[in-house]
Amino acid sequence: MAGLELLSDQGYRVDGRRAGELRKIQARMGVFAQADGSAYIEQGNTKALAVVYGPHEIRGSRARALPDRALVNCQYSSATFSTGERKRRPHGDRKSCEMGLQLRQTFEAAILTQLHPRSQIDIYVQVLQADGGTYAACVNAATLAVLDAGIPMRDFVCACSAGFVDGTALADLSHVEEAAGGPQLALALLPASGQIALLEMDARLHEDHLEQVLEAAARASRDVHTVLDRVVRQHVQEASVLLGD
């Protein structure tokens, strides 16, 4: 990536966006009738699909059941054609396991699990195309799928990435910006309360700049919430029309 100018003197990024500007987001809910909830999202060229089953009885050993809340199970996978590498990734490889764990931690903080003790909620997310902000796209798709399943949440959980280039915080990083190797973080936020569901950081960043990058990610996550809220309202309206309400 040597020699590539990530931020021009005029304040424009490689893809023409301003520093705090999101890539275009398009999303749909209810894309799979067989699942309790489902959603598809595009954030720029990153595309993710999420399906949700539950709450249902614990599968396997009953000893896994939690007496005071639901067990949240999250599994992540990426299609072999999702990146330019065309590399076959075995199910359950390290990256997939780490992403599944991050998603579980995120949604345990957002779902009102205490309303469904001794039950299980399964969230499956697959990335169909990866072009930066993979974790964020997975969270945002899963949020819509959980809502589509009618599972109560404390709030939407909305996610976005951010990085730091030439003294400027950049929101919603593309693959080119991520590959440049600068400091970057991923944030999952409950926008109404401002509670952080998950924060992960790659590479070192001086504490003087951390607040700036964190605020860029939080602001972008709130912008994501505006989009997702509109998607949910549109879905509810379309469902009401189909039901004749």
Swiss-Prot record:
The protein's role, per its UniProt record: Non-catalytic component of the RNA exosome complex which has 3'->5' exoribonuclease activity and participates in a multitude of cellular RNA processing and degradation events. In the nucleus, the RNA exosome complex is involved in proper maturation of stable RNA species such as rRNA, snRNA and snoRNA, in the elimination of RNA processing by-products and non-coding 'pervasive' transcripts, such as antisense RNA species and promoter-upstream transcripts (PROMPTs), and of mRNAs with processing defects, thereby limiting or excluding their export to the cytoplasm.
Gene encoding the protein: EXOSC4
Keywords associated with the record: Acetylation, Cytoplasm, Exonuclease, Exosome, Hydrolase, Nuclease, Nucleus, RNA-binding, rRNA processing
Family (UniProt): Belongs to the RNase PH family.
InterPro entries to which the protein is assigned, alphabetical: ExoRNase_PH_dom1, ExoRNase_PH_dom2, ExoRNase_PH_dom2_sf, PNPase/RNase_PH_dom_sf, Ribosomal_Su5_D2-typ_SF, RNase_PH
Disulfide-linked positions: none
GO cellular component: cytoplasmic exosome (RNase complex); cytosol; euchromatin; exosome (RNase complex); nuclear exosome (RNase complex); nucleolus; nucleoplasm
Compartment(s): Cytoplasm; Nucleus, Nucleolus; Nucleus; Nucleus, Nucleoplasm
Protein name stated in the entry: Exosome complex component RRP41
Pfam families (UniProt xref): RNase_PH (PF01138), RNase_PH_C (PF03725)
GO term, biological process aspect, one: U4 snRNA 3'-end processing
Modified residues (N-acetylalanine): A2
A single MF term (Gene Ontology): mRNA 3'-UTR AU-rich region binding
Complexes and interactors: Component of the RNA exosome core complex (Exo-9), composed of EXOSC1, EXOSC2, EXOSC3, EXOSC4, EXOSC5, EXOSC6, EXOSC7, EXOSC8 and EXOSC9; within the complex interacts with EXOSC2, EXOSC7 and EXOSC9. The catalytically inactive RNA exosome core complex (Exo-9) associates with the catalytic subunit EXOSC10/RRP6. Exo-9 may associate with DIS3 to form the nucleolar exosome complex, or DIS3L to form the cytoplasmic exosome complex.
